[in-house]
Amino acid sequence: MEEDLLRRAADLAERCERTATVTSTAFLTPAEQYALTNWARHRDCTLVLHGGGEGCERRAAFFLPFYLTAEDFDPAEHLRAVHFSAPFGAPGHRDYLGAILGLGIRREWVGDILVQDHGAYVFCLPSVAPALLELEQVGRTGVKAAAAE
């Protein structure tokens, strides 16, 4: 598994350098982040990990082109957040994750799921956000989804 990740990272770093555009992985587990960070230390590339919010456990890795510093990088251009409100119930993390995976969305396309009273924030890749916005039920609870700012 780690070998596949590092091979993919090498491809993304090379594409970033060749095209001078930001490239990124899907969301990574903490172990994958550790392996990738160690790999990047021995390469001539700028790697930034971001999960969409402060303190996120699952984060995507972004390879930055020569003209972009980590301080200038805006992850909001490459990640999305969807807010779910559940006024008549309080679904848990497992309920949200089950509903999302039930849509056919792979786990690595979704970052952290921050459950709050009567709602949750879900960080995801931009390609997944439209499907999440269509979600109307989590567990046995009706929900309303909206793009978070």
Stretches with model-predicted labels:
Residues 1-149:
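Non-catalytic terminal extensions of ATP-dependent helicases
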